[in-house]
């Protein structure tokens, strides 16, 4: 029989459920994702570093654990909240169950919670800090500790430590991927399009990248407050002066905008899920996209050289920027999907075209 577990919110609200995964207390930032599938990609997405994730879809774990679907080597999130988890998964690719995977990864989980009510609290009051505990009792000191929780050193904790290289079959373009907490599928999308890929740590300097003589630079997704990364932003500003074709995704999009003088802001509860609408400004066409971010570029803060290219269909926040003074563009959503729709995968082809045109 599962042990009782409690989710304690910073406002003192306590939800009771049952423990699964690793049994340990943890504190994190409480967020929700509306994705109906792709829970493995959610669990292994480095962008969830420091966060406790609620799955709004009620039944999770149906197809078990499939390592080929992972977006990183191991989870970075602090905790996992579901309504119900499937104890007998069924899939021809399945190599284990969710409970065992969370135990092996050191991630505590709670099931049996009313995730609908919990999500509505986050939607109404905004992102809250929380604690997974095994006692419903909480002292004022513990509540203060929960309230004061801050995600720190997010990029430093999720970036690779050493440079890695991957050759594409008949690859004729060389791309440097700056890893701020990159999802693996970004690299896969580039390699399958004929790009030889060099993945570098987040604090690689602009001069070091220039010395590699790349055809293009990809700025990856990643966790945390983008404005915390002052050294990286300064290097990106210098990198932009070199005129190398650049494509930014998610955190990479935000860091590129910050390097050009724009500002970012924290959203009330963020955009997380595989069903987020993004409207292309030029055409008015709406794409269904995969998103995972709690910050956004402030559209009105963009300099003259940055033109907003996509906006969110729900709240009209900035979802993309095209730059007129350099061969660069970026999007807030995830065109590599995994999990999610592939509607905007054409943006990788646009990047390929940009690199080839820059060669001429």
What feature does the model see in each segment?
Residues 211, 215-216, 220-288, 296, ...:
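Cysteine-nucleophile active-site neighborhood
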